[in-house]
Amino acid sequence: MIVVLAESALELVPRELWNHPVIQADAKRRGKKPGEILLDRARHHLAMSSLRDASKRGRPDIVHQVLLVFQYSLLNKRGLGRIYIHTQGDYTIYVRWETRIPKNYNNFVSLMEQLYATGRVPPKGEPLIELYKKDLSTLLRELGGRWVVLHESGVKKPFIELGAALLNSVVVIGGFPHGDFTNKWVLEKADAIYKIGDETMDAAQVVYRAITAAEVAAGLL
């Protein structure tokens, strides 16, 4: 199963916010320039009011939670999964299966800021995490040009059947807190759209259940 967390709410503070007092203060506190820190609604809420699509941005914690769920899963440890993070600004992050994601959120933030600064982590040697300028359409095309989406508008399938459908698929999941895909074609061109349960779930919960279903289908559980 290849998971693509699409339109994820992960980005550096955009240029139009660099001079805002909230951003200036946070950057000074951390000893960095405004353009070197992650946009985070928990700290930058007041600065984000005029930002385009503000409700979908500034939530790196979503990416953190998803990566913790995925990287420490049996599916990943057995080599049956890969994950790509497509972000605001059309960057794509690839995380190698053996990468240990920091469980501490502040350490994760520092790791992502290093990634944006250097394009890879670690800066030398074999990279564990890599950052590319690559839009969602290009990424999905490179992954085979076919995908399924987990979305609240989708068809509900029995858990075992869902796992079998996901195990050998590219699975697109929204990485934003509110709203829907800006790229409407993600749903329009999908091979299938499934939903997990009847309640709206956040991204980490969706990924957790998708992984579990795939693990059952693979005989890992």
Swiss-Prot record:
**Under the GO molecular function aspect, what terms does this record hold?**
rRNA (pseudouridine) methyltransferase activity; rRNA binding
Q: Which UniProt keywords apply?
A: Methyltransferase, Ribosome biogenesis, RNA-binding, rRNA processing, rRNA-binding, S-adenosyl-L-methionine, Transferase
Report the gene name: nep1
Q: Where is this site: Interaction with substrate rRNA?
A: R59, R100, K103, N107
**Entry's HAMAP family?**
NEP1 (MF_00554)
Q: What family does this belong to? A: Belongs to the class IV-like SAM-binding methyltransferase superfamily. RNA methyltransferase NEP1 family.
GO annotation terms (biological process): rRNA base methylation
EC class of the enzyme, as a word: transferase
The keyword Transferase appears for this protein: yes
Q: Site positions for Stabilizes Arg-59, renumbered to this chain?
A: D61
How does this chain assemble?
Homodimer.
Q: Output the Gene3D superfamilies linked to this UniProt entry.
A: 3.40.1280.10
| Phylogenetic classification of the source organism | Archaea, Thermoproteota, Thermoprotei, Thermoproteales, Thermoproteaceae
* PANTHER family in the cross-refs: NEP1/MRA1, RIBOSOMAL RNA SMALL SUBUNIT METHYLTRANSFERASE NEP1
For S-adenosyl-L-methionine, which residues are the binding ones? Answer: G174, G179, I196, G197, D198, E199, T200, M201
- Reaction equations catalysed: a pseudouridine in rRNA + S-adenosyl-L-methionine = an N(1)-methylpseudouridine in rRNA + S-adenosyl-L-homocysteine + H(+)
What functional role does this protein have?
Answer: Methyltransferase involved in ribosomal biogenesis. Specifically catalyzes the N1-methylation of the pseudouridine corresponding to position 914 in M.jannaschii 16S rRNA.
Signal peptide per UniProt = none
Name-wise, this protein is Ribosomal RNA small subunit methyltransferase Nep1
Which InterPro entries does the protein's record reference?
Alpha/beta_knot_MTases, Rbsml_bgen_MeTrfase_EMG1/NEP1, Ribosome_NEP1_arc, tRNA_m1G_MTases_N
